[in-house]
From Swiss-Prot:
Keywords: Cell adhesion, Cell projection, Disulfide bond, Glycoprotein, Membrane, Sensory transduction, Transmembrane, Transmembrane helix, Vision. This is Peripherin-2. The gene is PRPH2. It comes from Bos taurus. Glycans are attached at N53, N229, N263. Residues 42-62, 123-264 are lumenal. Retina (photoreceptor). In rim region of ROS (rod outer segment) disks. Pfam families: Tetraspanin (PF00335). Residues 341-346 are annotated as: Interaction with MREG. The chain crosses the membrane at residues 19-41, 63-79, 102-122, 265-283. One of its GO terms (cellular component) is photoreceptor inner segment.
Length: 346
């Protein structure tokens, strides 16, 4: 027994074909939007690849770009099919291809749904990538004279200014690394010598941060050096006073930015997926309604359309049997090839 059977007359078939034609062209626009979102995400990831240890994954943006292009192609073709569906002469050339085309549409819908899920799952991989990338980027902040790293100072400074953040997890991360180049240290100074000697690794560590950590909204001039020394500044207590620095770490700021971007992209992709599923269901009804016409030459005759020719369990059983037959066919072919090669070996 057919699943979700619906009766169609000529008027209903015409309305269905026209509605699907319009929906397909809206879906082409949706495909362009998905393509644009994928391209934008790819650019945003590449833009900050230096603070992601150059190990960021482009699987999701590449997938979005791919399904965006495929959506435009499939829906343009479906729009043409719907336009030709009510002309018997034009429909005849599409008839042999409709079943395979619908199967491809179902597969495309599955892929689109998986891509939407991947958008929501990207956060986990980004978190570890950002943690390692930012840590290494901060280590190379001082290497302004080293080829291949001379740009890192500008990259980190611009990042902290743009995202209003400081350090990896917070401003105290800068206390643990030497971010001032040896080129700008006076090694004849007793203070510099003492600081370097007091460190096991011979690094010049200070309780200070780069200028890009300063919050311009603070009414007080920026205090970026001797942050933990209350006596070094007038009317200052670092434990109780709200520091005029960005308190948020850059990892959290970037993760929040990319998470919002990915959640928005995932939501849009899910909406497009629902739209595509609706179109595929509509195409199935149009296909079965046209196939079920008793007299194709008489456009006025009634017909029946359905979603599945049999019930869900029967359809699933038939699908499994066809897969088994395909597997057995491949096995027989392989055995035949082995038998043909055996005499040659002897």
């Amino acid at each position: 027994m057919a699943l979700l059977k619906v009766k169609f007359d000529q008027k209903k078939r015409v309305k269905l074909a026209q509605g699907l034609w319009l929906m397909n062209w809206f879906s082409v626009l949706a495909g362009i939007i998905i393509f644009g979102l994928g391209l934008f995400l790819k650019i945003e990831l590449r833009k900050r690849s230096d603070v992601m240890n150059n190990s960021e994954s482009h699987f999701v943006p590449n997938s979005l770009i791919g399904v965006g292009v495929l959506s435009c192609v499939f829906n343009s073709l479906a729009g043409k099919i719907c336009y030709d569906a009510l002309d018997p002469a034009k429909y005849a050339k599409w008839k042999p291809w409709l079943k395979p085309y619908l199967a491809v549409c179902v597969l495309f819908n599955v892929v689109l749904f998986l891509v939407a899920l991947c958008c929501f799952l990207l956060r986990g991989s980004l978190e570890s990538t950002l943690a390692h990338g930012l840590k290494n980027g901060m280590k190379f902040y001082r290497d302004t004279d080293t080829p291949g790293r001379c740009f890192m100072k500008k990259t980190i400074d611009m990042l902290q200014i743009e995202f209003k953040c400081c350090g990896n997890n917070g401003f105290r991360d800068w206390f643990e690394i030497q971010w001032i180049s040896n080129r700008y240290l006076d090694f004849s100074s007793k203070e510099v010598k003492d600081r370097i000697k007091s460190n096991v690794d011979g690094r010049y560590l200070v309780d200070g941060v780069p200028f890009s950590c300063c919050n311009p909204n603070s009414p007080r001039p920026c205090i970026q050096y001797q942050l933990t020394n209350n006596s070094a500044h007038y009317s200052y207590d670092h434990q109780t006073e709200e520091l005029n620095l960005w308190l948020r770490g850059c990892r959290a700021a970037l993760l929040s930015y990319y998470s919002n971007l990915m959640n928005t992209t995932g939501a849009v992709t899910l909406l497009v997926w629902l739209f595509e599923v609706t179109i595929t269901v509509g195409l199935r009804y149009l296909h079965t309604a046209l196939e079920g016409m008793a007299n194709p030459e008489d456009p006025e005759c009634e017909s029946e359309g359905w979603l599945l020719e049999k019930s869900v369990p029967e359809t699933w059983k038939a699908f499994l049997e066809s897969v088994k037959k395909l597997g057995k066919g491949n096995q027989v072919e392989a055995e035949g090839e082995d038998a043909g090669q055996a005499p040659a070996a002897g």
